[in-house]
Amino acid sequence: YKRQLVDRIVPGFPRKDIAAIKEKLQYDDNMVVQAEIFHLWVIEAPQEVAAEFPADKAGLNVLFVPSEAPYHERKVTLLNGPHTVLSPVAYLSGINIVRDACQHPVVGKFIHKVMFEELMETLNLPKAELEKFAHDVLERFNNPFVDHQVTSIMLNSFPKYQTRDLPGLKTYLERKGKLPEGLVLGLAAIITYYKGGVRADGAEIVPNDAQEIMDLLKQLWATGDTAKVTEGVLGATFIWGEDLNLIPGLAEAVKKNLDSIQEKGMLETVKAIL
């Protein structure tokens, strides 16, 4: 098919529960994959294809549609976008699981702000439809049966931010005349996470990305100068395809957040924008 979209949160191998799962199955299966019940497969194709491949008649949530684009934009913006920025904010706040981040009195409000007050404002679909989708996403994030580790989401955070959050940041700035505070803080959180080290509770901070990005962040953080870190990251055209220092006010806002995270910690920095 020319264009498709799949939507399902798949945390991966259930290490914590694998012994109980094998006991229930009564055989060894080391290929077990944990996933949420929700699933969606959108296929851009004429209805003749649905007749030839009636997957939607097999109890599967499969949609055959004229255009996959609005489904793609909605999912990437309101599910993947929040995932990308909540994960470093949560981890640097001492939170390891997406569900716990959503239920946290401070980080939970941050997630809501990013979704409903910032990213949602950048989409052109009917507001009622977007609000329902966003609430459904939050319900999925709060799934009590899926322990979705935020560290698994943070793999390749810079390319993810570039595709999932940067378009929203630009559109928000264009429409509102100001930068979206949550998305800016999310970028600063990613930059801070790539500094590495350990959290206050002793947990390691281990970023994982393309070697060129890892080398750049190591070099920039070695200067100990958040202005140089900010300018260097935003100016890395091999990451962004452009120089983000040219976005009005962005460098100043990112540096301010970096300084606050270093001096006050993540939670206090988040509180300041709520």
Can you name each region flagged by the protein language model?
Residues 2-274:
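Substrate/ligand-engaging "lid" and interaction regions
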